């Protein structure tokens, strides 16, 4: 089991939760980004720097993740791809994507892209709240416990 992070867009507060979790769970945590990242010294935490470019980090995560891994991303197409490989996907707000919900999320994303392309101002996501952070940490623990039972 490995935790993969789409790190270019992952909020720092979520990365901090992940650093602590990697130590506590003693699981590999790999942050994939197209820029250099500073991470705490740990035998469980490492970075993987990829070339700049559209979806380069996403493609690397899809290539390397395996069934049973967890991918942290707000990128819905990336979440869909890792679900197809048997990995789990969790966004920084603590929403765990599933086969049952990912199609709806992809449809909504495509709809919002169409609105933006036609000039409609759709705005961005709300700021990450303390409740979002708690929900993320709880879902991360839930994933870990589920996978501990499978061993």
From Swiss-Prot:
Pfam name, any one: DUF188
* InterPro entries reported for this sequence: UPF0178
Q: To which protein family does this belong?
A: Belongs to the UPF0178 family.
Q: HAMAP family, per this entry?
A: UPF0178
Protein name as annotated: UPF0178 protein YaiI
């Amino acid at each position: 089991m490995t935790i993969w992070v789409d790190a270019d867009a992952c909020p720092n507060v979520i990365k901090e939760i992940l650093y602590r979790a990697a130590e506590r769970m003693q699981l590999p945590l790999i942050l994939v980004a197209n820029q250099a990242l500073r991470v705490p010294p740990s035998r469980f935490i490492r970075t993987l720097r990829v070339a700049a470019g559209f979806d380069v980090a996403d493609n690397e995560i899809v290539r390397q993740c395996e069934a049973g891994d967890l991918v942290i991303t707000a990128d819905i197409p990336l979440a869909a791809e890792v679900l197809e490989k048997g990995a789990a996907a969790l966004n920084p707000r603590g929403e765990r994507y599933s086969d049952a919900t990912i199609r709806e999320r992809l449809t909504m994303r495509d709809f919002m892209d169409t609105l933006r392309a036609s000039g409609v101002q759709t705005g961005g996501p709300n700021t990450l709240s303390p409740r979002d952070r708690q929900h993320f940490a709880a879902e991360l623990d839930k994933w870990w416990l589920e996978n501990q039972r499978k061993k």
